[in-house]
């Protein structure tokens, strides 16, 4: 959501600003997502790939979960994916592009203190899979990736050596690139990925 963070991420990806640039956008705000797509079209002329990756997790028993916390998770995790897809869908029709949502194994596996997070991720999986069926006729490919534990800054975590057993961000990056490289006749519509070994 912060422009400086988006610009720093862009610098890490490439120093050539003709190939990459950062845009701050709040996925809870549909107008933000529309503006982001407009900026992409203005700079590159087309939109081929969209990855919906924003996420928020608040883990409490349901009787302690506030209405604001519930709405924050639903607005970010579920409505955010809808906003991102809705804002980009016309351009993806033109390019016959690819939309990927990063869901979670929590989208099919419920757990204690996960009522709000589970609800949002179950919703993302259902929404993205239904959208995949809707959009195939336009030659738009839609996939859902459902990771297990990933070593990121999610939910206040500070990645460290203790996270070495987890999926690393670059593992997910490689998976996404592999999906894009597949023959267009094949559509991996739902992919589960988890650490190969349990927590040590």
Model regions: which residues?
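Active-site loop immediately N-terminal to the catalytic Tyr-X3-Lys motif
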Residues: 63, 109-115
């Amino acid at each position: 959501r912060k422009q400086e963070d988006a610009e720093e991420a862009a610098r890490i990806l490439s120093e050539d600003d003709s190939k990459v640039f950062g845009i701050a956008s709040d996925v809870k705000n549909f107008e933000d997502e529309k503006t982001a797509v407009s900026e992409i079209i203005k700079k590159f002329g087309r939109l081929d790939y969209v990855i919906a990756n924003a996420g928020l997790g608040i883990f409490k028993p349901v009787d302690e979960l506030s209405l604001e916390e519930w709405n924050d998770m639903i607005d970010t995790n579920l409505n955010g994916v809808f906003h991102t897809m809705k804002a980009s869908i016309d351009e993806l029709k033109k390019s016959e592009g690819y939309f990927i949502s990063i869901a979670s194994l929590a989208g099919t596996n419920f757990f204690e203190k996960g009522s709000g997070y589970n609800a949002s991720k179950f919703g993302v999986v259902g929404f993205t899979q239904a959208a995949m069926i809707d959009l195939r006729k336009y030659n738009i490919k839609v996939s859902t990736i459902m990771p297990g534990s990933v070593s990121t800054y999610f939910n206040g975590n500070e990645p460290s050596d203790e996270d070495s057993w987890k999926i690393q961000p670059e593992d997910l990056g490689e998976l996404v690139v592999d999906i894009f490289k597949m023959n267009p006749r094949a559509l991996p519509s739902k992919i589960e990925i988890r650490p190969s070994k349990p927590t040590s």
